[in-house]
Amino acid sequence: ISFTEAETNMEQQSTLKGKLDIRARLRIETGLHIGASSDFAPIGAVDSPFVRDPLSRQPIIPGSSLKGKLRTLLVRSMTEGYVLPDVKDDSDEVRRLFGAALKGKDGGEGGGKTARLQFFDLRLSEASFERLKELELETYIGEIKWENTINRITAAANPRQIERVPAGAEFDFRLVYNIEHEDEVAEDMALLGDGLQLLQMDYLGGHGSRGYGRVSLHDFTVSYFSLSAPDALTQEKLDEIAAVLAKGGQTS
């Protein structure tokens, strides 16, 4: 194995010092639409349904959607110009949080890096589910919003139905952060807090320019687990980390 390959492997397989379990409540402030495939929808179904858990049929927010949105917002905030860089050319701070593949989109070699952040699919909180299932909604725990586009030349209308998660719904938010270098935890948490702040000033899902997908984050908590150093982070320090993340949210 070459020195370069060994160096790459070391970067990909950094020592795991511990884990931070980050939790919060994500509240839907305006109707949310993260689309699911409608290729096999029955006649009379909604034109554009939202993504659901296949077992419970409840709406979910895919972890991939949240990860992609946070990363894109952070990269856009750091980039001058209109063209975003290839993922392999993201800043070191972004790459260590979100990871980077060995090959870029152009097929060229990049510096592969394992993501320190592990995302989860967000599911409705139990209290929110109990509240929403009692409402008379157009679909199961969903509302229908009619949208329309008008052809400027022919004046022909193109109405369609968009399924949304109703405003007021709350999801259980969770991230796990891998501690690899203790001296980088504060910087990583500050960057994550910036991303969460940007998210709440932007939108999640589709049709954001029309007012969809505004969200807020509340009630951050952080817990710590480590086999090698179980007492390395005090509760006071964990509360400080939660406060840093909450600067992008709102405390309640």
List the model feature ranges, each with a label.
Residues 2-149, 154-252:
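RNA-binding basic/glycine-rich loop and surface signature characteristic of RAMP-family CRISPR effectors
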